[in-house]
């Protein structure tokens, strides 16, 4: 039966090749513009207009001190994850390039992208909590007393979870950049007396500039909008943009979520434009 249906539904045998439909004349061009504009209007224009209206109407009810702290915390978290994740991706891919080893380790590091944020956050919470308990037990045994939650109660747990969650994004971006560097350049550098570290610093790093920028931008965007891991691992009395929006949406106070949603859009759109420009280059 499988072979029968496969033969029956084979596109190459039963259907003509797909051809792009071309619009002729001014009417066709206007139809294409209107159709694309309608998609943009429904998907971005109308929602953005409503967010602007709601943010303007309820701007007087905003706690600006808490809002600024939340925005700064989200920005610091995303920048930290982007910097550390991009650096680790470059180090791992450079090590794999120089030694032809570690391919399995890189694939293992990228498995977190296929795990949901909630499941990953629970695993990270178990690890960080056990680490904190062990540190407190050792400190108490040495007579220094309890040191508190130095791992699970800080931004470090979020950074760790986000790096595990989005490592694949940066690894793939850097790996794609390395694929465009011919091995003959590496051999030339080695013949000229450059060590592996010098080759990585003086050859690979400049050539991978666009790939590293792409990896950093992707990590920043993913970290800024991640919700489930942030809900479980954020320190007490600390909000990110995504958790702040979620709490107001859950309470059906949609207007109060408009301003942080706009801030997320304002932060994300220029980065997306820069990302597209970098990928084109």
Sequence positions of predicted segments:
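Interhelical loop and adjacent transmembrane-helix boundary motif
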Residues: 1, 23-29, 51-65, 224, ...
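Transmembrane alpha-helix signature in integral membrane proteins
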Residues: 1, 5, 65-96, 104, ...
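C-terminal transmembrane helix and the adjacent membrane-cytosol boundary/short C-terminal tail
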Residues: 1-23, 92-101, 175-186, 190, ...
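Membrane-interfacial helix termini and adjacent extracytoplasmic/periplasmic loops
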Residues: 14-22, 64-65, 100-105, 121-163, ...
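Periplasmic/extracellular loop-to-transmembrane helix junction in inner-membrane transport proteins
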Residues: 19-30, 49-83, 98-101, 145-150, ...
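Cytoplasmic-entry segments and transmembrane alpha-helices of multi-pass inner-membrane transporters
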Residues: 28-35, 92-128, 186
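Transmembrane alpha-helices
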Residues: 34-42, 111, 164, 171-174, ...
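Membrane-cytosol interface at the C-terminal ends of specific transmembrane alpha-helices
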Residues: 151-190, 216
């Amino acid at each position: 039966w499988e072979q029968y249906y496969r033969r029956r539904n084979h596109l190459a045998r039963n259907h003509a090749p797909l051809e792009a439909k071309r619009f002729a004349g001014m009417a066709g061009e206007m139809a294409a513009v209107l159709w694309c504009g309608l998609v943009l209007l429904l998907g971005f224009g109308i929602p953005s207009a409503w967010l602007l209206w709601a943010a303007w109407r309820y701007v007087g009810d905003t706690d600006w001190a808490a809002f600024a702290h939340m925005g700064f915390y989200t920005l610091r978290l995303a920048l930290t994850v982007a910097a550390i994740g991009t650096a680790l991706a470059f180090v791992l891919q450079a090590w794999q390039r120089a030694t032809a080893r570690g391919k399995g380790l890189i694939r293992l590091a990228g498995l977190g992208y296929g795990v949901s944020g909630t499941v990953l956050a629970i695993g990270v919470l178990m690890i960080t909590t056990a680490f904190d308990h062990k540190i407190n037990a050792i400190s108490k045994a040495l007579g220094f007393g309890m040191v508190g939650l130095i791992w699970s109660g800080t931004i470090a747990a979020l950074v760790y979870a986000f790096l595990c969650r989005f490592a694949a994004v940066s690894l793939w971006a850097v790996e794609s950049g390395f694929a465009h560097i011919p091995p003959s350049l590496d051999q030339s550098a080695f013949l000229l007396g450059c060590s592996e570290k010098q080759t990585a610093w003086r050859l690979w790093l400049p050539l991978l500039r666009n790939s590293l920028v792409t990896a950093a931008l992707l990590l920043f965007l993913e970290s800024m909008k991640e919700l489930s891991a942030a809900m479980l691992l954020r320190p007490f009395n600390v909000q990110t943009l995504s958790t702040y929006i979620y709490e107001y949406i859950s309470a059906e106070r949609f207007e109060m979520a408009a301003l942080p949603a706009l801030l997320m859009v304002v932060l994300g759109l220029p980065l997306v434009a820069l990302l597209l420009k970098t990928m084109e280059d």
